């Protein structure tokens, strides 16, 4: 790391509730790597998302603006290119901000043409970041990685996240998905991140590492599908009566 220049790893996860983070009170869960990150890093206990779903939430996180100001009010709504964001700001101070994962950003239509394929998907990458392992909407990179690893993809590639023999999410299930844990999308992101960081040497870096999980479908690979028993989970936080809710 260059003198006076910090290395920064920003990990963004999708739909992980704060009250299900062990270091923040969810002692019934086992997440040793996350525990270490919280222990050796900084945990912002009062940091809350300002918007839903994921695209608007990421727009707020990375621009520092409320939804009413950046106006990307739902997935596929374009983000105005005039807004400063974290990637652009980092470039101004000499970083080359890298991104693994995704930001669910639809481009400003004034910067491209109407046939731009990014308008036909749930979003692309936010300006300012350099992709070093994007989880593009078609997921071609991840599926190609699986094939290169020798995993036989089903005819409908997305079925890897379903239990064997199912063609739709079967509701609440403890059956494992078809892809093994070592070939999960989380493993893919982690491998790409480690490869990128090992190649940086002593140069300062900023890496936005965006994981897809625990985003649905809620079908985990073995052995994680059987790690917890439903009976051991805490009851939902409810009001005293349906009328109060």
Tell me what each language-model feature is:
Residues 1-245:
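Formylglycine-dependent sulfatase
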């Amino acid at each position: 790391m260059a003198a006076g220049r910090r290395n920064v790893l920003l990990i963004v996860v999708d739909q992980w509730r704060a009250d299900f983070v062990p270091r923040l009170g969810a002692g019934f869960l086992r997440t040793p790597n996350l525990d270490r990150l919280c222990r050796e890093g900084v945990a912002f206990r009062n940091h809350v998302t300002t918007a839903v779903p994921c695209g608007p939430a990421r727009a707020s996180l990375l621009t520092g603006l409320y939804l009413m100001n950046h106006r990307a009010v739902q997935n596929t709504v374009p983000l105005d290119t005039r807004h400063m964001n974290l990637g652009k700001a980092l470039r101004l101070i000499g970083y080359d901000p890298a991104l693994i994962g995704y930001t669910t950003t639809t481009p400003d239509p004034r910067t491209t043409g109407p046939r731009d394929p990014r308008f036909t998907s749930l979003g692309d990458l936010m300006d300012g970041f350099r992709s070093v392992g994007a989880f593009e909407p078609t997921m071609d990179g991840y599926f190609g990685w699986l094939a290169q690893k020798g995993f036989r993809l089903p005819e409908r590639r997305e079925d890897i996240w379903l239990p064997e023999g199912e063609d739709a999410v079967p509701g609440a299930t403890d059956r494992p998905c078809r892809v093994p844990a070592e070939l999960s999308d989380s493993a893919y992101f982690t491998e790409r991140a480690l490869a990128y960081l090992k190649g940086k040497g002593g140069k300062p870096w900023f890496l936005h590492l965006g994981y897809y999980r625990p985003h649905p479908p809620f079908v985990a690979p073995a052995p994680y599908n059987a790690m917890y028993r439903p009976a051991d989970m805490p009851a939902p936080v409810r009001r005293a009566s349906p009328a109060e809710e």
